[in-house]
Amino acid sequence: MIGRLRGELVSKQPPFLLLDVQGVGYEIEAPLSTFYDLPEPGGQVTLHTHLHVREDAHVLYGFASESERALFRSLIKVTGVGAKMALAILSGMTASEFSRCVMDGDVASLVRLPGIGRKTAERLVVEMRDRLGSLPAAVTLTGGKPAAAAARAPDPVSDAVSALVSLGYKPQEASRLISAVEGEAERSEDLIRLALKATLK
């Protein structure tokens, strides 16, 4: 099991990033909350990782904090929630926002996330309510607010749309969400954050 990687950030395009660790390039999938904290390519990055083994592939997921990884690992144990959906949840809201939704039984906010229907949202509330108590305190206490600058993408609008599609949004819906906030930010990470925030209103 690969639990942590430290190396040079080679490239990033949500949800994928490439990390060079002593000459070996690791392709890693990460939630948008982690992308917000990444430096520009060439900077040093430490990621807490989870190796997900499937019949057809071994996929490495990376997280900015141990608490975020702990929440991911707990989410994929919920019936009907796979790694892709867990990544979409962590991309669509902070750990503290998710915790609040679960504790308050706020199904309405959860169904706004891509790929989550009412039954899945209700299952998340039921199954995660007890599990939250065993997770690191940071999951429920920290806001996980986006921070740190990242390199401006050559085409931030297209990158932002592609990122939303990879999270489960339909192409037309992703384009509509990004178009609505296009004039409010320049970096793809900021466009994505604003678009996702708008879906929760």
Curated annotation (Swiss-Prot):
Gene3D superfamilies in alphabetical order: 5' to 3' exonuclease, C-terminal subdomain, DNA helicase RuvA subunit, C-terminal domain, Nucleic acid-binding proteins
Domain of life per record: Bacteria
Keyword Amino-acid biosynthesis: no
SMART domains: HhH1
GO biological process, one term: DNA recombination
Region feature Domain I, mapped onto this chain: 1-64
Pfam families: HHH_5, RuvA_C, RuvA_N
GO MF annotation terms: ATP binding; four-way junction DNA binding; four-way junction helicase activity
Region (Domain III): 153-201
Span list, region Flexible linker: 144-153
Cellular localisation: Cytoplasm
Annotated GO CC locations: cytoplasm; Holliday junction helicase complex; Holliday junction resolvase complex
Region (Domain II): 65-143
Main location: cytoplasm
Keywords, sorted A to Z: Cytoplasm, DNA damage, DNA recombination, DNA repair, DNA-binding
Protein purpose: The RuvA-RuvB-RuvC complex processes Holliday junction (HJ) DNA during genetic recombination and DNA repair, while the RuvA-RuvB complex plays an important role in the rescue of blocked DNA replication forks via replication fork reversal (RFR). RuvA specifically binds to HJ cruciform DNA, conferring on it an open structure. The RuvB hexamer acts as an ATP-dependent pump, pulling dsDNA into and through the RuvAB complex. HJ branch migration allows RuvC to scan DNA until it finds its consensus sequence, where it cleaves and resolves the cruciform DNA.
UniProt xrefs under HAMAP family: DNA_HJ_migration_RuvA
Recorded domain comment: Has three domains with a flexible linker between the domains II and III and assumes an 'L' shape. Domain III is highly mobile and contacts RuvB.
UniProt record similarity statement: Belongs to the RuvA family.
Quaternary structure annotation from Swiss-Prot or TrEMBL: Homotetramer. Forms an RuvA(8)-RuvB(12)-Holliday junction (HJ) complex. HJ DNA is sandwiched between 2 RuvA tetramers; dsDNA enters through RuvA and exits via RuvB. An RuvB hexamer assembles on each DNA strand where it exits the tetramer. Each RuvB hexamer is contacted by two RuvA subunits (via domain III) on 2 adjacent RuvB subunits; this complex drives branch migration. In the full resolvosome a probable DNA-RuvA(4)-RuvB(12)-RuvC(2) complex forms which resolves the HJ.
Stated name of the protein: Holliday junction branch migration complex subunit RuvA
Organism: Thioalkalivibrio sulfidiphilus (strain HL-EbGR7)
